[in-house]
From Swiss-Prot:
Transmembrane segments: none annotated. GO terms for cellular component: cytosolic small ribosomal subunit. This is Small ribosomal subunit protein bS18. Binds as a heterodimer with protein bS6 to the central domain of the 16S rRNA, where it helps stabilize the platform of the 30S subunit. It comes from Beijerinckia indica subsp. indica (strain ATCC 9039 / DSM 1715 / NCIMB 8712). Pfam families: Ribosomal_S18. InterPro entries: Ribosomal_bS18, Ribosomal_bS18_CS, Ribosomal_bS18_sf. It comes from the Bacteria.
Length: 80
């Protein structure tokens, strides 16, 4: 006869904090291609916020900055 095991708590993954919020967080600027390229996939697509843990407001700013940099030719639209 076996004894009942203690009930398991469900696995809780802690939400990462937004890298653009905080006292010394970097500003999102369309001219900062090194920062923007960290949020673009290998194929040139904008990485979703559920992967990068960027807040919704900052994700919109980030997407606008990436699109602006693409339009000005600072970032590529597609990476082959």
């Amino acid at each position: 006869m076996t004894t009942p095991a203690a009930p398991r708590r469900p696995f809780f993954r802690r939400r990462k904090t937004c890298p653009f919020s905080g006292p010394n967080a970097p500003k999102i600027d369309y001219k900062d291609t090194r920062l923007l390229s960290r949020y673009i996939s290998e194929r040139g697509k904008i990485v979703p916020s559920r992967i990068t843990a960027v807040s919704a407001k900052k994700q919109r700013e980030l997407a606008q900055a990436i699109k602006r940099a693409r339009f000005l030719g600072l970032l590529p639209y597609v990476i082959r």
